[in-house]
Amino acid sequence: SIRNSIDKVNKDVSVNICRWAFPGTWARSIARSWRISPDIRPRWSSVKRIIDLNLYLSAYCGGGHYNDMDMLEIGRGMPRNEEEVHFGMWCIMSSPLMIGCDMQTIPEASLSLIKNEELIALNQDPLGLQAYVVQHEGEGYVLTKDIGRRRGTERAVALYNPSDSACHFNVPLSLLELGGRVRLRDLVRRCDLEPVSDSIVCDLPARSLRLLRAEGLYRTDPVAYEAEWAYLPCFDALGKVKHQVLYAANPD
Protein backbone atom coordinates (compact mmCIF):
# COMPACT_ATOMS: atom_id res chain seq x y z
CA SER A 1 0.00 0.00 0.00
CA ILE A 2 0.99 3.66 -0.29
CA ARG A 3 1.20 3.94 3.50
CA ASN A 4 3.54 0.95 3.79
CA SER A 5 5.75 2.32 1.03
CA ILE A 6 6.02 5.70 2.76
CA ASP A 7 6.93 4.02 6.05
CA LYS A 8 9.84 2.27 4.33
CA VAL A 9 11.28 5.63 3.19
CA ASN A 10 11.97 6.58 6.82
CA LYS A 11 11.01 10.23 6.24
CA ASP A 12 8.47 12.44 8.00
CA VAL A 13 5.76 12.44 5.33
CA SER A 14 2.25 13.78 5.89
CA VAL A 15 -0.51 11.81 4.20
CA ASN A 16 -3.93 13.32 3.51
CA ILE A 17 -6.99 11.25 2.60
CA CYS A 18 -9.47 12.84 0.22
CA ARG A 19 -12.86 11.23 -0.31
CA TRP A 20 -14.89 14.46 0.20
CA ALA A 21 -16.26 13.36 3.60
CA PHE A 22 -14.89 12.23 6.96
CA PRO A 23 -13.70 8.71 6.06
CA GLY A 24 -13.87 7.06 9.49
CA THR A 25 -11.64 6.33 12.44
CA TRP A 26 -9.58 3.89 10.40
CA ALA A 27 -7.98 6.90 8.70
CA ARG A 28 -5.91 7.72 11.80
CA SER A 29 -3.65 4.73 11.20
CA ILE A 30 -2.93 5.84 7.65
CA ALA A 31 -3.05 9.63 7.42
CA ARG A 32 -2.35 12.76 9.42
CA SER A 33 -5.36 14.60 7.98
CA TRP A 34 -8.44 13.97 5.87
CA ARG A 35 -10.83 16.06 3.87
CA ILE A 36 -14.33 16.29 5.34
CA SER A 37 -16.16 18.01 2.49
CA PRO A 38 -16.45 18.51 -1.26
CA ASP A 39 -14.02 20.98 -2.86
CA ILE A 40 -14.29 24.54 -1.59
CA ARG A 41 -15.41 27.44 -3.77
CA PRO A 42 -14.81 31.19 -3.24
CA ARG A 43 -18.36 31.91 -2.12
CA TRP A 44 -20.23 32.05 1.17
CA SER A 45 -22.46 29.03 0.58
CA SER A 46 -19.40 26.81 0.17
CA VAL A 47 -17.61 28.14 3.26
CA LYS A 48 -20.76 27.81 5.37
CA ARG A 49 -21.40 24.26 4.16
CA ILE A 50 -17.90 23.12 5.09
CA ILE A 51 -18.20 24.64 8.56
CA ASP A 52 -21.56 22.88 8.97
CA LEU A 53 -19.98 19.54 8.07
CA ASN A 54 -17.20 20.01 10.64
CA LEU A 55 -19.22 21.36 13.58
CA TYR A 56 -19.57 17.94 15.21
CA LEU A 57 -16.34 16.19 14.21
CA SER A 58 -14.18 17.58 17.03
CA ALA A 59 -13.73 14.15 18.64
CA TYR A 60 -11.73 12.99 15.62
CA CYS A 61 -9.21 15.84 15.75
CA GLY A 62 -6.18 15.74 18.03
CA GLY A 63 -2.98 13.86 18.65
CA GLY A 64 -1.49 15.13 15.40
CA HIS A 65 -4.57 14.33 13.31
CA TYR A 66 -6.80 16.97 11.74
CA ASN A 67 -10.09 17.46 9.91
CA ASP A 68 -9.06 19.18 6.67
CA MET A 69 -11.58 21.83 5.60
CA ASP A 70 -9.78 22.39 2.27
CA MET A 71 -7.69 25.34 1.10
CA LEU A 72 -8.31 28.98 1.96
CA GLU A 73 -10.31 31.13 -0.44
CA ILE A 74 -9.16 34.37 1.20
CA GLY A 75 -8.41 37.09 -1.35
CA ARG A 76 -10.71 35.75 -4.04
CA GLY A 77 -13.59 38.20 -3.87
CA MET A 78 -15.57 37.47 -0.72
CA PRO A 79 -16.45 40.48 1.49
CA ARG A 80 -14.43 41.17 4.62
CA ASN A 81 -16.95 39.74 7.11
CA GLU A 82 -17.15 36.44 5.22
CA GLU A 83 -13.37 36.21 4.97
CA GLU A 84 -13.11 36.72 8.74
CA VAL A 85 -15.55 33.86 9.31
CA HIS A 86 -13.67 31.70 6.82
CA PHE A 87 -10.20 32.20 8.27
CA GLY A 88 -11.30 32.39 11.90
CA MET A 89 -13.27 29.15 11.82
CA TRP A 90 -10.48 27.32 9.98
CA CYS A 91 -8.12 28.48 12.75
CA ILE A 92 -10.24 27.55 15.78
CA MET A 93 -11.13 24.21 14.17
CA SER A 94 -7.42 23.43 13.66
CA SER A 95 -7.81 22.83 9.95
CA PRO A 96 -4.60 22.75 7.90
CA LEU A 97 -4.09 26.22 6.40
CA MET A 98 -3.21 26.28 2.70
CA ILE A 99 -3.35 29.53 0.73
CA GLY A 100 -5.54 29.18 -2.36
CA CYS A 101 -5.18 32.58 -4.02
CA ASP A 102 -2.64 34.39 -6.19
CA MET A 103 -0.27 36.03 -3.72
CA GLN A 104 0.71 38.62 -6.32
CA THR A 105 -2.81 40.01 -6.54
CA ILE A 106 -4.25 39.40 -3.06
CA PRO A 107 -5.86 42.57 -1.61
CA GLU A 108 -4.01 44.15 1.31
CA ALA A 109 -6.94 43.62 3.71
CA SER A 110 -7.05 39.91 2.88
CA LEU A 111 -3.29 39.62 3.22
CA SER A 112 -3.34 41.26 6.65
CA LEU A 113 -6.01 38.77 7.75
CA ILE A 114 -4.03 35.65 6.87
CA LYS A 115 -0.90 37.23 8.40
CA ASN A 116 -2.66 37.78 11.73
CA GLU A 117 -0.18 36.22 14.15
CA GLU A 118 -2.75 35.68 16.90
CA LEU A 119 -5.05 33.70 14.61
CA ILE A 120 -2.15 31.66 13.27
CA ALA A 121 -1.03 30.94 16.84
CA LEU A 122 -4.54 29.73 17.63
CA ASN A 123 -4.44 27.36 14.67
CA GLN A 124 -0.96 26.16 15.62
CA ASP A 125 -1.71 25.73 19.34
CA PRO A 126 0.36 22.79 20.66
CA LEU A 127 -2.73 20.93 21.89
CA GLY A 128 -4.02 20.68 18.32
CA LEU A 129 -7.64 20.46 19.44
CA GLN A 130 -10.74 21.37 17.46
CA ALA A 131 -13.36 23.67 18.97
CA TYR A 132 -16.71 22.06 19.75
CA VAL A 133 -20.25 23.46 20.01
CA VAL A 134 -21.42 24.35 23.52
CA GLN A 135 -24.41 26.50 22.57
CA HIS A 136 -26.77 26.65 19.59
CA GLU A 137 -29.66 29.03 20.08
CA GLY A 138 -31.57 30.46 17.15
CA GLU A 139 -29.12 30.86 14.30
CA GLY A 140 -26.02 31.38 16.44
CA TYR A 141 -23.35 28.90 17.48
CA VAL A 142 -20.84 29.12 20.31
CA LEU A 143 -17.74 26.95 20.09
CA THR A 144 -14.83 26.62 22.49
CA LYS A 145 -11.66 24.65 23.08
CA ASP A 146 -8.72 24.52 25.46
CA ILE A 147 -5.53 26.28 24.41
CA GLY A 148 -2.13 26.09 26.05
CA ARG A 149 -2.97 23.19 28.34
CA ARG A 150 -5.89 20.87 28.92
CA ARG A 151 -8.32 21.90 31.64
CA GLY A 152 -6.40 25.15 32.05
CA THR A 153 -7.83 28.63 32.59
CA GLU A 154 -7.40 29.79 29.00
CA ARG A 155 -9.79 28.91 26.19
CA ALA A 156 -10.58 30.03 22.66
CA VAL A 157 -14.20 30.98 21.99
CA ALA A 158 -16.04 31.55 18.71
CA LEU A 159 -19.39 33.32 18.49
CA TYR A 160 -20.54 32.39 14.99
CA ASN A 161 -23.53 33.82 13.14
CA PRO A 162 -23.97 32.07 9.78
CA SER A 163 -27.43 33.52 9.16
CA ASP A 164 -28.52 36.36 6.91
CA SER A 165 -29.74 38.50 9.82
CA ALA A 166 -28.33 39.86 13.07
CA CYS A 167 -27.96 37.46 16.00
CA HIS A 168 -27.86 38.07 19.76
CA PHE A 169 -25.51 36.06 21.95
CA ASN A 170 -25.66 35.57 25.71
CA VAL A 171 -23.07 33.02 26.75
CA PRO A 172 -22.85 32.10 30.45
CA LEU A 173 -19.28 31.62 31.59
CA SER A 174 -20.37 28.29 33.06
CA LEU A 175 -20.72 26.96 29.50
CA LEU A 176 -17.10 27.89 28.90
CA GLU A 177 -16.06 26.29 32.22
CA LEU A 178 -14.35 29.48 33.35
CA GLY A 179 -14.82 31.20 36.69
CA GLY A 180 -13.99 34.52 38.29
CA ARG A 181 -13.24 37.69 36.36
CA VAL A 182 -12.61 36.55 32.79
CA ARG A 183 -10.32 38.57 30.56
CA LEU A 184 -11.22 38.70 26.86
CA ARG A 185 -9.19 39.45 23.76
CA ASP A 186 -10.58 39.84 20.23
CA LEU A 187 -8.18 37.82 18.08
CA VAL A 188 -9.38 39.17 14.73
CA ARG A 189 -9.08 42.83 15.71
CA ARG A 190 -6.17 42.18 18.09
CA CYS A 191 -7.53 44.21 20.96
CA ASP A 192 -8.50 43.60 24.59
CA LEU A 193 -12.15 43.80 25.59
CA GLU A 194 -13.76 44.60 28.92
CA PRO A 195 -13.49 41.68 31.37
CA VAL A 196 -16.70 39.85 32.30
CA SER A 197 -17.82 37.99 35.41
CA ASP A 198 -21.12 36.36 34.43
CA SER A 199 -21.57 36.02 30.68
CA ILE A 200 -20.41 37.20 27.27
CA VAL A 201 -23.11 39.29 25.62
CA CYS A 202 -22.95 40.72 22.12
CA ASP A 203 -24.88 41.24 18.90
CA LEU A 204 -23.35 40.12 15.63
CA PRO A 205 -24.44 41.15 12.14
CA ALA A 206 -25.20 38.60 9.45
CA ARG A 207 -22.45 36.23 8.34
CA SER A 208 -19.97 37.25 10.99
CA LEU A 209 -17.72 35.94 13.74
CA ARG A 210 -16.36 37.12 17.07
CA LEU A 211 -13.26 35.13 17.93
CA LEU A 212 -11.99 35.47 21.49
CA ARG A 213 -9.29 34.30 23.81
CA ALA A 214 -10.82 34.01 27.27
CA GLU A 215 -8.77 33.67 30.45
CA GLY A 216 -10.48 33.00 33.76
CA LEU A 217 -9.22 32.92 37.32
CA TYR A 218 -10.06 29.24 37.66
CA ARG A 219 -11.61 26.33 35.79
CA THR A 220 -15.12 25.16 36.67
CA ASP A 221 -16.80 21.78 36.21
CA PRO A 222 -18.61 21.10 32.92
CA VAL A 223 -22.34 21.86 32.87
CA ALA A 224 -23.06 20.56 29.36
CA TYR A 225 -22.66 17.10 27.88
CA GLU A 226 -23.61 16.54 24.25
CA ALA A 227 -23.85 13.27 22.35
CA GLU A 228 -22.34 15.05 19.34
CA TRP A 229 -19.01 15.27 21.19
CA ALA A 230 -18.74 11.49 21.35
CA TYR A 231 -15.91 9.53 19.80
CA LEU A 232 -17.23 6.51 17.89
CA PRO A 233 -14.28 4.10 17.70
CA CYS A 234 -15.70 2.00 14.86
CA PHE A 235 -17.03 4.81 12.67
CA ASP A 236 -16.63 3.80 9.02
CA ALA A 237 -18.12 6.06 6.36
CA LEU A 238 -17.65 3.37 3.73
CA GLY A 239 -20.38 1.36 5.44
CA LYS A 240 -19.04 -1.99 4.29
CA VAL A 241 -18.54 -3.58 7.69
CA LYS A 242 -21.08 -3.99 10.46
CA HIS A 243 -19.57 -3.29 13.88
CA GLN A 244 -20.77 -4.00 17.37
CA VAL A 245 -21.40 -0.76 19.25
CA LEU A 246 -18.50 -0.02 21.60
CA TYR A 247 -18.06 2.85 24.02
CA ALA A 248 -14.53 4.12 24.44
CA ALA A 249 -12.66 7.29 25.29
CA ASN A 250 -11.10 9.42 22.60
CA PRO A 251 -7.56 8.02 22.19
CA ASP A 252 -6.16 11.51 22.67
Residue ranges and their predicted role:
Residues S1-D7:
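Short, well-ordered alpha-helical packing segments
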Residues W90-M93, M98-G100, H136-L178, R207:
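Carbohydrate-binding surface patches
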Residues D7-D102, N123, Q135:
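Glycan-recognition surfaces
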Residues V85-V134, S208-E226:
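Catalytic cores of secreted or luminal carbohydrate-active enzymes
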Residues Q104, L127, R149, P162-S165, ...:
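Short, glycine-/Ser/Thr-/acidic-enriched flexible segments
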